Swiss-Prot record:
Keywords: Host-virus interaction, Membrane, Signal, Viral attachment to host cell, Viral attachment to host entry receptor, Virion, Virus entry into host cell. Forms the envelope pentamer complex (PC) composed of gH, gL, UL128, UL130, and UL131A. The pentamer interacts with host NRP2. Belongs to the HHV-5 UL130 protein family. The keyword Membrane applies. Residues 1-25 form the signal peptide. It comes from Human cytomegalovirus (strain Merlin). Plays a role in viral entry into host cells. Forms a pentameric complex at the surface of the viral envelope together with gH, gL, UL130 and UL131. This complex is required for entry in epithelial, endothelial and myeloid host cells. Mechanistically, engages host receptor(s) including neurophilin 2/NRP2 to mediate infection. It is found in: Virion membrane. The gene is UL130. Its main location: virion. This is Envelope glycoprotein UL130.
Length: 214
């Protein structure tokens, strides 16, 4: 984090030299930060999120894509002419650090994930799926709209594994496909299909007809 701040400071000096832009009146004058002494710069909190965002705006470089699972929350920040009226995002990770990012494909994915993760309907679905004896679950129209806005219509996962039958072995592929759909009456349905194939698409193999008990 300290290295990142030094790099940002260097870019500020470079901008001053090239564009003759005064950097003395930086937003740090209205910015207060609490530094956690151990480890240094592990946590940085700002009195005003707008100040935090606009300070980094002139030399804000996109970060490499990151997994949504690394983050615990986010905040949108509307800026002014100093940031060309852009909307910036403060992304809070699980170590207490904050990323200031412009809108990008991976940032939109993180926002989409975080905005739906804490919704009640999305927390109920895994519990319902693990208890098939519960039958149909009644959900409200609002819950169905939230689910429809955050669901992934189709997902496909592949898993390769080896079946060893003494002297012979074969490379197998397990494909898990799942579908989710919200109908016009706001009812929700799920479908799951599990298929086994041989890696070279052979028809009758241990992969499709294993003599195993799992």
């Amino acid at each position: 984090m300290l290295r990142l701040l030094l790099r940002h400071h260097f870019h500020c000096l470079l901008l001053c030299a090239v564009w003759a832009t005064p950097c003395l009146a930086s937003p740090w004058s209205t910015l207060t930060a609490n530094q956690n002494p151990s480890p240094p710069w592990s946590k940085l909190t700002y009195s005003k999120p707008h100040d935090a965002a606009t300070f980094y705006c002139p030399f804000l470089y996109p970060s490499p894509p990151r997994s949504p699972l690394q983050f615990s929350g986010f905040q949108r920040v509307s800026t002014g002419p100093e940031c060309r009226n852009e909307t910036l995002y403060l992304l809070y990770n699980r170590e207490g650090q904050t990323l200031v990012e412009r809108s990008s494909t991976w940032v939109k994915k993180v926002i989409w994930y975080l905005s739906g993760r804490n919704q009640t309907i999305l927390q109920r679905m895994p519990r319902t799926a693990s208890k098939p004896s519960d039958g149909n679950v009644q959900i409200s129209v609002e819950d169905a709209k939230i689910f429809g806005a955050h669901m992934v219509p189709k997902q496909t996962k592949l898993l390769r594994f080896v079946v060893n039958d003494g002297t012979r072995y074969q490379m197998c592929v397990m494909k898990l496909e799942s579908w989710a759909h919200v109908f016009r009456d706001y009812s929700v349905s799920f479908q799951v299909r599990l298929t086994f194939t041989e890696a070279n698409n052979q028809t009758y193999t241990f992969c499709t007809h294993p003599n195993l008990i799992v």
